[in-house]
């Protein structure tokens, strides 16, 4: 896995960030939230690899189920740019579709079985 510094943003540009991460192997998760948001996610990366350049005050937090994972969304446009994982709160993933220099449709992906991690009924 080759790590690059990527620039990214939400759709409206209120949230801008840089992240040092490889983009492959890309992953889709089958949990109830990820199924609905449909994002293609980067491999895990450490929290220190993410830098919010602007718009931290434009982010809103959504948590469900065990309340461990932290899913961030732009308050203005609703786009999900990144999340802190449930598996390890020191690890994050970024929505590859938010990266300026990457075509998410050109990447192959695997499926992460987030559905089996659920401890409550599917929403």
Task: Kindly give the residue locations of the regions a language model identified.
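A short Gly-Trp-Pro
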Residues: 1-9, 14-123
């Amino acid at each position: 896995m080759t790590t690059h510094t990527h620039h990214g943003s939400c759709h409206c540009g209120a949230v801008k960030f840089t992240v040092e991460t490889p983009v492959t192997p890309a992953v889709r998760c089958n949990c109830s939230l990820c199924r609905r948001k449909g994002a293609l996610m980067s491999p895990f990366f450490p929290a220190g690899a993410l830098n919010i350049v602007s718009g931290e005050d434009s982010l809103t937090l959504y948590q469900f189920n065990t309340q461990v994972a932290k899913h961030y969304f732009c308050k203005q446009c609703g786009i999900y740019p990144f999340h802190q994982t449930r598996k390890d709160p020191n690890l994050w993933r970024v929505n590859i579709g938010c990266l300026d220099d990457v075509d998410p449709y050109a990447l192959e992906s695997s499926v992460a079985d987030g559905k089996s991690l659920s401890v409550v009924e599917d929403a």
